[in-house]
Amino acid sequence: MTWRMGPRFTMLLAMWLVCGSEPHPHATIRGSHGGRKVPLVSPDSSRPARFLRHTGRSRGIERSTLEEPNLQPLQRRRSVPVLRLARPTEPPARSDINGAAVRPEQRPAARGSPREMIRDEGSSARSRMLRFPSGSSSPNILASFAGKNRVWVISAPHASEGYYRLMMSLLKDDVYCELAERHIQQIVLFHQAGEEGGKVRRITSEGQILEQPLDPSLIPKLMSFLKLEKGKFGMVLLKKTLQVEERYPYPVRLEAMYEVIDQGPIRRIEKIRQKGFVQKCKASGVEGQVVAEGNDGGGGAGRPSLGSEKKKEDPRRAQVPPTRESRVKVLRKLAATAPALPQPPSTPRATTLPPAPATTVTRSTSRAVTVAARPMTTTAFPTTQRPWTPSPSHRPPTTTEVITARRPSVSENLYPPSRKDQHRERPQTTRRPSKATSLESFTNAPPTTISEPSTRAAGPGRFRDNRMDRREHGHRDPNVVPGPPKPAKEKPPKKKAQDKILSNEYEEKYDLSRPTASQLEDELQVGNVPLKKAKESKKHEKLEKPEKEKKKKMKNENADKLLKSEKQMKKSEKKSKQEKEKSKKKKGGKTEQDGYQKPTNKHFTQSPKKSVADLLGSFEGKRRLLLITAPKAENNMYVQQRDEYLESFCKMATRKISVITIFGPVNNSTMKIDHFQLDNEKPMRVVDDEDLVDQRLISELRKEYGMTYNDFFMVLTDVDLRVKQYYEVPITMKSVFDLIDTFQSRIKDMEKQKKEGIVCKEDKKQSLENFLSRFRWRRRLLVISAPNDEDWAYSQQLSALSGQACNFGLRHITILKLLGVGEEVGGVLELFPINGSSVVEREDVPAHLVKDIRNYFQVSPEYFSMLLVGKDGNVKSWYPSPMWSMVIVYDLIDSMQLRRQEMAIQQSLGMRCPEDEYAGYGYHSYHQGYQDGYQDDYRHHESYHHGYPY
């Protein structure tokens, strides 16, 4: 008995030891479900868990069917040495992968295990980005734009809302390159209950729009974060820092948004870096095309097209194989596109490779087999790239960039040929990026490795361009200034003598700007000749003999050397000085006859201010000056002021005003002089064309009147050339004329003009453009057209307008009445003071202008119609029938952005109208009136109103 019980006891002890050494399967499974990070071991044939996760998902293996039939064999294989096989970088693991790659095909279809999904989630932040690559379904959707893009959020109750449709109508196909150039991305939110939804509109560098649906659960979060009101249209413009830059409660023109963005300092840098961006974008030919994409959170709808794009790029990629490893990488990218194609084409791609070790070919083929049987998912990219990046720190940015990028950006980020195209555009960066591209062929580095060297190299490139610009300016400045003497030599009658004198002085003193000053002196003297003809004829007779002697001397100088000519010039100069001292009469004659020598003599002794004094001397006592500086001729403030004074040509002429305009920066300016004269006055010519670009003269003129800035600036002087008023912004010429009419010199002129019967008559017909430019950015127009003044609708509208002068004035409204049919037409313009006073100025509108205005606004003369024109010149609303109350019109105007700024200024100044004029809608009760009265009334006039910001 003892002998028989001995083996049994030994058997029991052995079984107890074996059972005690195995881990409990249920505990392991519970740990995985609880969220613990499990070892890198798969329960299937001791293969690494990461590879089995890919194959399991690709085959769709379900966890329940994977565990139950094979539970016991998997448990028997779990032992201590399995931890060594968990390292995916060891060579034995790769042989196991190759040997076991075909086994999942014999299994039933199911999903990957929950334990493996938890393992993927806990690996790194990269896995989260893979699940939410675009951010369209991620709660931190705005974080994907931070630091890179400006975000334009449009919120509306539903897609058929009036303001929303109007805003989308402004987004024509030709505006998206401008938006892309400013790095603007769009988010559209619909927040009405039951219709919640939205979309993310990403604008590519080619102007293409990639639309992705937005998770409806994110709408309330975004609405509360951006402080958008439910049930109302609203827009928010976010900076790149995700701070609110501007809010719009109504549709606005894109130019207004551009203006807000372009004021930022970062925008100036973007303009410099992106020169020619809009032209390249429009040349791509895809601007405004909308491409609908699915939500990338599950690797859905957008993937097949992404794979097809990579297929198109593959031939270019395969043409540049730098090493064997890069060729293998090409094969893997080809294999990644295989889901869109049948399985057989992947095999000839593997065979077309150049001769390589057998391990490389078998490894690439096994990858193709693994990926080809399933739709392409986000985990395929890290699998193919793992053997080529030994350090894991480089790999996550690459995979993140690949998955989060949209269709155009994939081709840019994955394939070096696009980067080489970029380097061809910037030749100065060819040195350092060449190293980066060679590195990319081995490691598939993230895009940041390429962008950093290129930006560093681009910096010196920009400075180098600036230095070249400086050198060009340096070479150009000496040539520009000596240029004027050449035409100056051709004008005087004494050509040879003048050429000789100028050349000698140039060689002796190296004064580059003297010829322009001498020519200026000559022009001033010639301009004074017709004023004293009788005296000058006598002076000519007295000075004929010395003139002949000097001509003989000048002829001899042409034959002599330069030294002799200089001596003779000095003698002639001494004689002229002596004659000056003897009599004042001879002085005037000398300046006229010897004018070609005296300016040069003066130039040696006179200070530089004398040239400015000579210029201003021609205006002193005769003309009033309006001096204007502007950065360029297209400057908005200058254009506004120019249009203003050009409309008042006759009034400028009667007040004897000359306008001197200086364009450009302080150190490189050009000048323009306009004289406003009556028909009976002789045309003035003060300076020659060469003097208009004389930098010394212009700089002295700037200093004389303190106009040393590059901004718009305007100075008004009287006939004594003393400053009477400075203007930093454009001003209406009526204000300028009122100021001039208070001058003592002007009062005398007015009395003289009345005696002589000088009356300002506008001979030319006023054009429509000039008429409308008078109100642009200054006044809003309320145009009322009727067939006659007895029309019922017209009379009803006039009764509604009575007593509204204060409200019209504070809102900068001008009423334009157009009456008549056929040839018997006419009009009246009513101007209301902007301070709210009841004084109204009326002007008659000629018949031809009435017809032009009706044609321009498409107004029929047969029927009553009224329309509101904003300060930007666009029609804001139409009224085919009379408005019994002006409340609706006022509310529409008060909702405009520019009007809100005006209201803030007027409130600070205490400017307001009595409440009874506005039926209880005073300024202090504006918000209540806007919400109570406007919302109800607006629905009845929704077909007429168009909300614009001006």
UniProtKB/Swiss-Prot annotation:
Coiled coil: 560-587
Positions with biased composition (Polar residues): 376-385, 435-454, 598-609
GO biological process, one term: response to bacterium
Superkingdom in the source lineage: Eukaryota
InterPro entries in UniProt: DUF4174
Gene that this sequence comes from: CCDC80
Tissue: Expressed in dermal papilla and dermal fibroblasts (at protein level). Expressed in heart, thymus, placenta, pancreas, colon, epithelium, spleen and osteoblasts.
Cross-linked residues, Glycyl lysine isopeptide (Lys-Gly) (interchain with G-Cter in SUMO2): K545, K548
Residue ranges with Low complexity bias: 348-374
Disordered: annotated segments: 28-64, 88-119, 289-609
Subunit description: Binds to various extracellular matrix proteins.
Name assigned to this protein: Coiled-coil domain-containing protein 80
Subcellular location field: Secreted, Extracellular space, Extracellular matrix
PANTHER family: COILED-COIL DOMAIN-CONTAINING PROTEIN 80
Signal peptide (UniProt feature, chain positions): 1-21
PTM annotation, UniProt: Phosphorylated.
Summary of the function given for this chain in its UniProt record: Promotes cell adhesion and matrix assembly.
Organism for this UniProt entry: Homo sapiens
Induction context: Down-regulated in cancer and after osteoblastic differentiation. Up-regulated by dihydrotestosterone (DHT).
Basic and acidic residues compositional bias, start-end: 104-119, 308-317, 418-428, 462-478, 487-499, 538-582
Family note: Belongs to the CCDC80 family.
Chief site of localization: secreted
GO cellular component, one term: extracellular region
An MF annotation (GO) of this entry: heparin binding
UniProt keywords, alphabetically: Coiled coil, Extracellular matrix, Isopeptide bond, Phosphoprotein, Secreted, Signal, Ubl conjugation
